[in-house]
Amino acid sequence: MALWPLLNSGMLVRTGHTVLTWGITLVLFLHDTELRQWEEQGELFLPLTFLLLVLGSLLLYLAVSLMDPGYVTAQPQPQEEPKEEQTAMVPQAIPLRRCRYCLVLQPLRARHCRECRRCVRRYDHHCPWMENCVGERNHPLFVAYLALQLVVLLWGLYLAWSGLQFFQPWGLWLRSTGLLFTTFLLLSFFALVVSLLLASHLYLVARNTTTWEFISSHRIAYLRQRTSNPFDRGPTRNLAHFFCGWPSGPWETLWAEEEEEGSSQVV
């Protein structure tokens, strides 16, 4: 019963996004844009490419919004015996805590999401446009979605501009171009928002931090007493780990390495 309102709102948001996506695409095909001109001239390569990009962005959106973002399970999973060097590297008092809402033991960088009512590993933020959290499992796909969506929006913006006719009487212009101009304004707004989101997330990924950690570092137990980010290993390694999973390893290990380096510098 408690999950039904969440699922219902998620279905509404995803349906709205899908309808808006194909509605804008239809407007670009129905008006006298370059997209329609290519189609009428039999040059189908670019229209088909545009449609495939739109479809790809929509599939990525649905994948990110529907997949498990990295929920923390209450039952601990069986793990292999840790190697001796890893055991020596991890300190005895890593600042883990039990969630006061769902009562699971939170791994490092996890946070409870009140909208999803679950704890999420490497929590970044809860995205209302997707009605899902962005966390450890779906964050790379989220960034890929933003990149592809920006390409589609910029191309759509160009196509909408190509169909605008400005030298017409006001009444005739409103009837013939009003809907296309509204589409142009929507695409401009969405392109600006997605550009800012993509730039900010690439910046955070290059520093191996999350939106939540960046905003609330002064309130997070494992960050507030640090002068630097303990998970930062340089932009190249951070990006490689984020998109390719290399080098792999638990966040506790990175935190412990930084702790060990800090202790040695103090000594």
UniProtKB/Swiss-Prot annotation:
Spans within the Cytoplasmic topological domain: 1-9, 65-140, 200-267
Topological domains, Lumenal: 31-43, 162-178
Subcellular location: Golgi apparatus membrane; Endoplasmic reticulum membrane
PROSITE patterns assigned to the protein according to its UniProt record, in alphabetical order: DHHC
Transmembrane segments: 10-30, 44-64, 141-161, 179-199
Catalytic reaction list: L-cysteinyl-[protein] + hexadecanoyl-CoA = S-hexadecanoyl-L-cysteinyl-[protein] + CoA
Enzyme class: transferase
Entry GO MF terms: palmitoyltransferase activity; protein-cysteine S-palmitoyltransferase activity
Keyword Signal attached: no
GO biological process: gephyrin clustering involved in postsynaptic density assembly; negative regulation of NLRP3 inflammasome complex assembly; peptidyl-L-cysteine S-palmitoylation; positive regulation of synaptic transmission, GABAergic; protein targeting to membrane
Principal subcellular localization: Golgi
Active site: 127
GO cellular component: dendritic spine; endoplasmic reticulum; endoplasmic reticulum membrane; Golgi apparatus; Golgi membrane
Keyword entries, A-Z: Acyltransferase, Endoplasmic reticulum, Golgi apparatus, Lipoprotein, Membrane, Palmitate, Transferase, Transmembrane, Transmembrane helix
EC number: 2.3.1.225
Occurrences of domain DHHC (ranges): 97-147
Lipid bilayer topology: Multi-pass membrane protein
Comment on protein domains: The DHHC domain is required for palmitoyltransferase activity.
Family: Belongs to the DHHC palmitoyltransferase family.
Name of the protein: Palmitoyltransferase ZDHHC12
Lineage of source species: Eukaryota, Metazoa, Chordata, Craniata, Vertebrata
